A protein has these predicted regions:
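Active-site-proximal substrate-binding core of FAD-dependent oxidoreductases
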Residues: 183, 196-218
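Secondary-structure boundary elements
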Residues: 8-17, 42-44, 141-146, 199-208
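Conserved FAD/dinucleotide-binding core of flavoprotein oxidoreductases
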Residues: 101-155, 175-188, 203, 207
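Short, solvent-exposed loop/turn elements at beta->coil junctions and helix N-caps
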Residues: 24-25, 154-159
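Residue-level marker for buried hydrophobic side chains located in beta-strands
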Residues: 169-171
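Predominantly flavin-linked oxidoreductase catalytic cores and closely associated redox partners
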Residues: 2-137, 194
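Single, function-defining residue in the core of a domain
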Residues: 133-136, 161-166
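Short, conserved secondary-structure transition motifs
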Residues: 82-87, 157-161, 215-218
Length: 218
């Protein structure tokens, strides 16, 4: 909803074009990404911002930037997430996120206005997905949705790319990296990365030092 609000009330009124198409090819040249090819058109730009999530289509899949895994110290790499109803909204609607340790990981509980966002984080090295789902449902009790299709299984790539701005590609958020803590760092990292990118783009010319500094700062 936050992203939808930003699009409708901030980006579009300022002239940002929202194009919904699937990228089918990403040719490269000496500057990095040459263009983004869809089924109907090829889009050319001076700078490409990779915001493709864990897929990291531009930085990782296209430019092959090395990825430094942190799974040796942060083993959690999977999660089940679901939208759960309130049992007693008046008493359950809290202004904070609650985290609870259970058998093989921890559960986040984020009270929203009309529902609760909740999920179970674990490592698939120690427990399989189906067993983890059963543990999660047991923890939720009567709040647990009955249909498995209501649950989303997420595979997390824990670590960060060696460089976050390579040639004409700058990675933002999960496409840059992810560190699984006791609270998702997604929104914070997106905000900070964009702020740093804007500061660099205000310069008369972006140098390799600026690109390296973007990686160091972020």
């Amino acid at each position: 909803k936050f992203g939808q609000w930003l699009k409708e009330h901030y980006c579009l009124p300022k002239g940002v074009k929202h194009i919904q198409e699937d990228i089918v090819d990403v040719p490269t040249n000496e500057n990095g990404v040459k263009c983004l090819v869809t089924k109907t058109y090829s889009y050319y730009a001076d700078l490409y911002i990779d915001c493709t999530g864990f897929k990291s289509l531009l930085l990782d899949k296209t430019l092959n930037e090395p990825f430094e895994s942190l799974t040796d110290t942060l083993p959690n790499n999977s999660a089940w997430a679901v939208r759960a109803p309130y049992r007693d909204r008046e008493n359950e609607l809290k202004p904070y996120t609650n985290c609870t340790a259970i058998e093989n990981g921890w559960v986040w509980n984020i009270p929203l206005w009309n529902r609760v966002g909740t999920g179970y984080v674990y490592s698939d090295k120690f427990i399989d997905d189906e067993t983890a789902l059963k543990e999660f449902q047991k923890h939720l009790g009567s709040r647990a949705p009955k249909n498995k299709s209501d649950y989303k299984n997420i595979k997390m790539r824990v670590g960060i790319h060696k460089r976050l701005w390579v040639k004409n590609v700058a990675a933002i958020g999960l496409s840059a990296g992810f560190i699984e803590p006791l609270e998702s760092n997604g929104l914070f990292s997106v905000h900070e990365f964009l702020g740093e990118l804007i500061r660099n783009l205000k310069r008369e010319k972006v140098s390799q030092f600026d690109r390296d500094n973007f990686t160091f700062t972020c």
